[in-house]
Amino acid sequence: MLVAADGAGSVCRQLLSVPVTQQHSDEVSMAFCLTLSVPHQQRAWQRFTQQGTLAILPMREANQVRLVWTCSAALAQDVVGWQPEQWVQHVNSVYRGYCPAVVSARLLQQFPLRISQASRQHVGRCLLMGNAARTFYPTTAQGFNLALRDVAALAQLLVQAKQNQRAIDATLIAEFVAWRQPDQTRVMQITAAMNTVFGLQLPGWSVLRGLGLSAVELVPFLKPRLAQRLLGYSGRVPD
């Protein structure tokens, strides 16, 4: 079998003639390399602001992290022209009290945000995985987490097939797709909803949003249920 995990511009997907539905956005994601004042201890942080969504992800080096800042194209055009000191100042103002202080920042790249979905996930014994199959809003690392669950599920099926001396054929791959599709659809819906909820700037909306977040925090069953869905523990999960 062929597992195609070659990214959003997948050459394998093109060679397989799998159509892709794309939803273009007026948003841009910018990636920065940040240096923290103290080690990150493998923690990640995300903030939703009026200037967009900012996610900080730990890297291998103890004090190095990546910042992915998703915002409107108009704002991004201004931000890329800032001096490094301005990036540091803005990130520290957004994350004050939530994560270690940023001492330096360097812009790595920027790219337009596109939401895409392949019309099918497999052709025969060829399987599309990760961004080759779908891309969506970069919210709470859900795309990465989903890909890890997909890989774990595929590995489980392949191990079971070998143990049972079963052929690794199109039928087995179809079983994988049927298993994983509900989780994939759920994550796409959740990330789209979160982007809408935190992106709207209507009068009074921030108050309603705050009340909703307070309800999640206070109502006993809401927070665990939401966490289960975001962590991928709802429905059938890989062993």
Task: Give the positions of each predicted feature.
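Gly/Ser/Thr-rich helix-start
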Residues: 8, 18, 53, 131, ...
